[in-house]
């Protein structure tokens, strides 16, 4: 979309059944993680507000990554989220409201003119993590000059409920970066990195290798008698 007037402020209001990451002109919007939080999706849905004033240019592009979250939970576990009555494919709705210096306002909303495509994340689950294929990632997909002719048109659908309200709780954010306190090498293909404490977080690794190489990163709270990871809990 194109903006031709001077901007005073701009806000985006986004609700998702599942999880989302929002991008504007190639930049990730906000520092929150795992938004929006869990609700009874068939009774209430939450929207999150972001100030995007500093993100906007004359020519702009919005990109969104959708994840399953608690809405489309496939993994089997004691809580039986895989049998939830609301379960369906992830979806979102969004309003972008721009206030111009001349006092006028403009609202851009998500609709069927948006385009969609699969990306590098080919599987994702709150419980079992994600599978990522870097060869499927399209560089610049969330920038204005990206050619999306091969992408498909999105499908217009309904929200899981008619009760969409603001998410008012404190967001999940990065607190600190932890480096491994110990590394154990079992063989040329298997390593364990010990962090020294039990945390909620994500792993970040930098690797080099041949195209098509498969890397598996598994998280565990326990070690067995041999010092290997134990997923029994």
Kindly give the residue locations of the regions a language model identified:
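Extracellular/oxidizing-compartment recognition motifs
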Residues: 1-233
């Amino acid at each position: 979309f194109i903006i031709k007037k001077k901007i005073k402020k701009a806000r985006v209001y986004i609700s998702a059944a599942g999880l989302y990451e929002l991008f504007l002109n190639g930049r990730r919007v906000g520092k929150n993680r795992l938004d929006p939080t869990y609700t009874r999706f068939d009774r209430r849905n939450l929207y999150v507000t972001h100030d995007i004033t500093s993100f906007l240019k004359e020519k702009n592009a919005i990109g969104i990554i959708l994840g399953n979250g608690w809405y489309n939970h496939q993994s089997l576990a004691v809580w039986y989220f895989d049998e939830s009555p609301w379960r369906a494919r992830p979806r979102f709705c969004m309003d972008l409201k721009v206030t111009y210096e001349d006092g006028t306002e403009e609202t851009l909303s998500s609709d069927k003119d948006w385009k969609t495509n699969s990306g590098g994340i080919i599987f994702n689950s709150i419980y079992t993590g994600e599978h990522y294929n870097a060869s499927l990632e399209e560089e610049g997909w969330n920038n204005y000059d990206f050619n999306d002719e091969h992408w498909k048109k999105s499908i217009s659908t309904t929200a899981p409920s008619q009760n969409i309200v603001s998410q008012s709780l404190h967001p999940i954010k990065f607190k600190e970066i932890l480096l491994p306190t110990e590394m154990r090498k079992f063989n040329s293909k298997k390593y364990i990195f010990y962090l020294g404490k039990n945390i909620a977080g994500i792993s970040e690794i930098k690797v080099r290798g041949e195209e098509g190489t498969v890397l598996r990163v598994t998280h565990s709270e326990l070690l067995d008698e041999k010092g290997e990871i134990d997923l029994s809990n």
